[in-house]
Amino acid sequence: MNLQRFPRYPLTFGPTPIQPLKRLSAHLGGKVELYAKREDCNSGLAFGGNKTRKLEYLIPDALAQGADTLVSIGGVQSNQTRQVAAVAAHLGMKCVLVQEHWVNYDDPVYDRVGNIQLSRMMGADVRLVADGFDIGIRRSWEDAMESVRQAGGKPYPIPAGCSEHPLGGLGFVGFAEEVREQEAQLGFRFDYVVVCSVTGSTQAGMVVGFAADGRADRVIGIDASATPERTREQITRIARHTAELVELGRPIADADVVLDTRYAGPEYGLPNDGTLEAIRLCARLEGVLTDPVYEGKSMHGMIDMVRRGEFEPGSKVLYAHLGGVPALSAYAEIFRDG
């Protein structure tokens, strides 16, 4: 496998820490050891997160093309767009963000706080669009790029989650390589990795990276899209493309992509009671915050799987904390009493 042949622009602090979740593990019976790899602490750029790791491989391409404007898309409370805005500010580039109405949640301040507030503070041109949730290529995003061209600029396209970008899976191949180095220091290997999946390139990169040591199917994706067929297809397609890029040396099989669909409800961006319980439990036992759109759902999945005995006794499970905490303020009504 050859990830090193791709240029990388450093946007993160370095390897993200692995934190034992001792109190949560004990609360759930102590038979499974839970750990968190803190991608939410990976950068000093506006809270960082998993997209910042991905952008390290996109930015060299943007600079090589002479782009002056990063153009991205997401929902109103998109973590992706906030991270793109931060990187643009850091590099002295312009930024145009298309923010679509992906979540059926009504709150008078939803489009004024959290991620979107931070993006505006960092100077991004934020454009609200009424279109609903979709993980694919969007006309509104293509229109935004054309508007930059018409104004004499040179846009660089960064799709939702970086996922439909040809290089979008590379960052989390690097995640897997990083975990292997940390495992050597820890003296053990993780039996499972739990990760939230929506647009797919985070899990896709992990699948490729862990396929190198036979653990592709030990990456358990927790669907948060509530459109799991599309998410599974996108993960698989991106993983196969990424495997070719890094010369993995073996094909990605359908069985390599594990996507658990039990925890996405009631729909994208809205938490159910199990998700809310998981968010509060992790916060109160570990001081680790998760959000109701993504990480709360993957935390719910991991906790429920432990309770159901779906991990063998003695298993060591690594929870990939991808970020997302800035969105919590947009859900203040849900958490008004904690």
From Swiss-Prot:
Subunit structure: Homotrimer.
Alphabetic keyword roster: Hydrolase, Pyridoxal phosphate
Secretion signal, residue range per the UniProt entry: none
Gene3D superfamilies given in the database record: 3.40.50.1100
EC number: 3.5.99.7
Function: Catalyzes a cyclopropane ring-opening reaction, the irreversible conversion of 1-aminocyclopropane-1-carboxylate (ACC) to ammonia and alpha-ketobutyrate. Allows growth on ACC as a nitrogen source.
Protein name, entry field: 1-aminocyclopropane-1-carboxylate deaminase
Origin species: Burkholderia vietnamiensis (strain G4 / LMG 22486)
Catalytic activity reported: 1-aminocyclopropane-1-carboxylate + H2O = 2-oxobutanoate + NH4(+)
Gene field: acdS
Active site: S78 (nucleophile)
HAMAP family cross-referenced by the UniProt entry: ACC_deaminase (MF_00807)
Molecular-function GO terms, alphabetical: 1-aminocyclopropane-1-carboxylate deaminase activity; D-cysteine desulfhydrase activity; pyridoxal phosphate binding
